[in-house]
Curated annotation (Swiss-Prot):
Keywords: Cell inner membrane, Cell membrane, Membrane, Transmembrane, Transmembrane helix. It is a multi-pass membrane protein. The chain crosses the membrane at residues 9-29, 54-74, 84-104. InterPro entries: DUF2645. Residues 30-53, 105-110 are periplasmic. GO terms for cellular component: plasma membrane. Pfam families: DUF2645. The keyword Transmembrane helix applies. This is Inner membrane protein YgiZ. The gene is ygiZ. Residues 1-8, 75-83 are cytoplasmic. It is found in: Cell inner membrane. It comes from Escherichia coli (strain K12).
Length: 110
């Protein structure tokens, strides 16, 4: 029983790390990243418009969070409440990470 719970937590952490890496590498691209000099910060380059960031965020959420939502619904249907709450918590963390990558890191630039 404890081994299964530890495995579930490990799977959730692995999914969070994979999602963060995929969003940062493939979905949160900025067409001005080539202007970033070594030692410079993100505020020194122009940023992509808000509409483009919303579109990128929605595409990333569709591809990366849909499997997690399906898993949450399955765990709820099967009445496996520990796994359900672990994956709901993972979904929340993935949403916060996505917010940070698309909008949060630009807060201090304005």
């Amino acid at each position: 029983m404890l081994k299964q719970k530890i495995k579930t937590i490990f799977e959730a952490l692995l999914y969070i790390m994979l999602t963060y890496w995929l969003i940062d590498s493939f979905f949160a691209f900025n067409k001005y990243d080539w202007m970033l000099e070594s030692g410079g910060n993100i505020c020194s380059i122009p940023s992509v418009s808000g509409e483009d960031r919303i579109l990128q965020a929605m595409i990333a959420a569709f591809f990366l969070l849909t499997p997690l939502i399906i898993l949450i619904l399955r765990k709820l249907f099967m009445r496996e409440m520990f796994e359900f709450w672990v994956y709901v918590f993972s979904l929340g963390i993935c949403l916060v990470c996505g917010w940070w990558l698309f909008w949060g890191r630009f807060i201090f630039c304005y």
